[in-house]
Amino acid sequence: QRGNASPALSELPLLQETAISLGTAIEQKKGKEKESVSILERYCEALYEAYLTLQEGLSGDASGEIAADQLAMEQLATDQLIKAGNCLKDLKEVLERDCKRQVVFLLHSAKHFASLRPLIDALREREDTEVKLMPIPYFDRMGDGSLSEMHYEGENFPKEYPITDYRSYNFLAELPDCIVMNSPYDAFNPVWSVDPFFYSEKLKQYTNKLVYIPWFVTDEIDPENPEDRKAFYNMQYYVTVPGIFHADYTIVQSEGMRAAYLEKISRFLEKEMEQKEEHPASKEACLKEKSTEELMQMMQQKIFGVGSCLLGEKEGQGTKEVVESLKQILFEKK
């Protein structure tokens, strides 16, 4: 606002601090030579020049009137701010190139690689995406629930795929755009467990898009069909587990199985809510403070009956559909 530079003088240093923080983060993750860093430096210089210009104009107005030289100073500051704005326009384009979307695939077993391989191949072809294939350790579970022998199968994955070492990757620094997991059990598998660091509840701290894709397919299950009663009962072991609730998105093999998942979850939640008053401390954190209706609405939005890569080119529910679904999650959904 002409004649009142005080608000701008307060805001400009804050904008500069934000730009410096962003530049530092880019340097740490991508290196100092990135064009986005140099654009941010020019942006900061333009803000600083505008700040000095406004400050000089403000101090030069001793009479309290808007003198001609002060108006000239304000026009100069406006030009400098326009220059800063142009830097931001350039920055948006360059950031899309310098800072690729990063997707981390977590697998504990090499034999499950086939369930995700087409997705990895499709994303590796994109120039705007950085793919990390990260085998993670898993443990046998003793009868008392404690973890015993550790297994790591990183050496068993196909050699043509670069492996990211889970011991050197810094999730907190990287904050990947998407994490794809295929083990939803967390601590609730009685036979084995991935390293607790990779439990779904913890992974949610590091990404806004946690995706669960089962490593297996099953026969279609109809909850209302008496012949499927046992199969529907057994769904409790892989559906009503923490990863399904913590994941932002779950991709299952068909619309029919999506309906079965939702029915199983609905019955599970009804039972959980009945026990809420008796055992409130035992409830999962992701289930607390929400009604059954709220949770079911959430699950309906999160579970997609798209297909499975294990079904190959099966029309309507094969690799193509799964690849397109993951691309939509990664590039279109907020």
Each PLM stretch: what is its role?
Residues 297, 306-321:
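Structured N-terminal alpha/beta-domain signature
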Residues 101-299, 303-305:
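Active-site and donor-binding regions of nucleotide-sugar-utilizing enzymes
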Residues 1-178, 183, 187, 316-330:
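N-terminal pre-catalytic "stem/leader" segment of glycosyltransferase-like enzymes
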